[in-house]
Amino acid sequence: MSDSSSMPEFALEATDLRKTYAGSKNAPPKEALKGVDLRVRRGSIFGLLGPNGAGKSTFINIFAGLVNKTSGTAKTWGIDIDRDSRAARAAIGVVPQEINMDVFFTPHETLELMAGFYGVPKEERRTDELLEAVGLSDKRDAYVRQLSGGMKRRLLVAKAMVHTPPVLVLDEPTAGVDIELRRQLWAYVRELHARGTTIVLTTHYLEEAQELCDEIAIIDQGEVIACEPKETLLKRMDSKTLVIDPVEPMAAVPAELAGYDAEIREDGSLAITYRYGEQSVAEMIEKFRASGARIDDLRTEEADLEDVFLALTYHRESA
């Protein structure tokens, strides 16, 4: 990577980005992106979330050069995709959701071929280094058709990195893979990020976004409905839950807690939901003890990204 003073502030920039797909006899035109304004900061791990059909793939494919925008501007690494499409495409690597590779090539041949497409000189190619990084060194000369689904997905990551792009987009990178491989891919994403690569991640696994991303945008029906640091987004759900496991089973919420949002859960625990800074946990515990009940264990639960996602998208559906 070059001196940071010469690098752009944003890895990806979209200003009033619009895409309308043509209609047909049986269907009207489809407005996939409705004036999207979005900035992905250089050096971040950025999560792009949204329901199916929200416009995530259209957004990514415009930057990848696979879809033509209807209007608006898009820049990759400070390069306008209209003014210098070749340089803009060279600044981004995209790992597609679909596994689509020639099964009669080996992983080594696949990466060499892709490096050739990007014009990477032979002496600058990192084919073996990339295979090592994604754990496929021992499959270097095997045919792609002999690889497992997880191995093929890792090879896709290596393919996207042959030209050392400063921006890497992973579209549902762990869809359909087991938990162990998911963790391995997460570790590799962190390693790439540590080397200076800006990561853009789309995923249906909200746990994945919460685990990896430091900034998250939620897109729904072609519009960005939230774009904030992860911690700020999580604070939108400004409630916590105090969960008390009583020593003896409880048939009902104690009268002493009548003024609280409390319930007995199926597992017998008492859950009290409260807002940050408005109610005292110590006071709740004191009132619980005043009822004569004894505490076996207690813990607090906070909203996770799934709660925020559902709340934001549900409110739009019901509006």
Predicted regions and their residues:
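Conserved ABC transporter NBD signature motif
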Residues: G72-R83, A88
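Walker A (P-loop) phosphate-binding loop of ABC-type ATPase nucleotide-binding domains
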Residues: P51-G55
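Conserved catalytic motifs of ABC-family nucleotide-binding domains
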Residues: T164
